[in-house]
């Protein structure tokens, strides 16, 4: 009975939110998303950040002063993964500016809550700038007005598949990114499937980066909640990853 009920609830969630492609507007949907997908998306982003930042040709000045731009941040999964990497790597952090871009005001509020709790617990100086809008609604100076001269880390976590659906203009967005004279790093990750891959290919074509750290597909171990068994379990998950410096 519980398994049947769980299947019905998951099916209703997927139908109501277009498999979470629509901005989440209900508290229960935010919770369902995190339960179903949150941990796996966190692990994918942590994998790419952890891998790239130990590469010998990747350098970041300490104490760290940086700006993190989380595109389609949802509930802040990618930002939390980035912060956790810095903490667990025992890197000195002077100041982090987080620009959260998310059309759902409810998800954005939840992201701010989790990030501020993390910052307080770790005693990190973090400034959060929340932009409740779509990518196409961003002001041309959304970066210049927020980032000072900090290196910028642009995080695309499970979002590039929406490019294929025509939900936003990746060409326009990358032009805004490239206008900034700062150091710009891109970290993008998603489950490996065809529509998502088109977004990754377009991102590479539009940005024409100077340095490519990663641009590949692969498989990683992720822990996921399985509604059929009502518990978490490990599985091999296909991923598409992209990391570059413009």
Model-derived features with residue positions:
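N-terminal auxiliary segments of SAM/dcSAM-dependent transferases
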Residues: 1-17
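Conserved SAM-binding loop of SAM-dependent methyltransferases across substrates and taxa
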Residues: 75-92
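S-adenosyl-L-methionine
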Residues: 109-148
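Class I SAM-dependent methyltransferase Rossmann-like catalytic core
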Residues: 19-59
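Conserved SAM/SAH-binding beta-strand->alpha-helix loop
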Residues: 104
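Conserved beta-strand signature within the Rossmann-like core of class I S-adenosyl-L-methionine
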Residues: 181-192
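A short SAM/SAH-binding and catalytic strip from SAM-dependent methyltransferases
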Residues: 150-166
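Class I S-adenosyl-L-methionine
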Residues: 197-246
């Amino acid at each position: 009975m519980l398994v049947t009920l769980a299947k019905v609830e998951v099916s209703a969630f997927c139908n109501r939110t277009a498999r979470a492609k629509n901005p989440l507007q209900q508290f229960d949907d935010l919770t369902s998303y995190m339960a179903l997908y949150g941990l796996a998306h966190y692990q994918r982003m942590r994998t790419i950040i952890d891998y790239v930042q130990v590469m010998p040709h990747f350098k970041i000045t300490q104490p760290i002063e940086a700006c993190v731009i989380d595109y389609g941040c949802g509930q802040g999964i990618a930002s939390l993964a980035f912060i956790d990497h810095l903490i667990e790597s025992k890197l000195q952090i002077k100041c982090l500016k987080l620009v959260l871009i998310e059309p759902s005001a409810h998800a954005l509020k939840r992201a701010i809550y989790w990030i501020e709790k993390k910052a307080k617990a770790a005693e990190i100086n973090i400034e959060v700038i929340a932009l409740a809008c779509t990518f196409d609604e961003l002001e041309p100076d959304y970066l210049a007005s927020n980032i000072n001269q900090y290196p910028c880390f642009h995080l695309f976590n499970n979002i590039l598949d929406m490019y294929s659906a025509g939900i936003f203009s990746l060409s326009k967005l990358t032009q805004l990114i490239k206008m900034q004279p700062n150091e710009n790093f891109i970290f993008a990750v998603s489950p490996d499937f065809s529509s998502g891959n088109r977004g990754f290919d377009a991102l590479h074509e539009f940005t024409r980066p100077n340095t490519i750290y990663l641009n590949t597909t692969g498989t990683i171990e992720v822990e996921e909640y399985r509604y059929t068994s009502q518990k978490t379990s490990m599985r091999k998950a296909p991923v598409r990853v992209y990391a570059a410096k413009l």
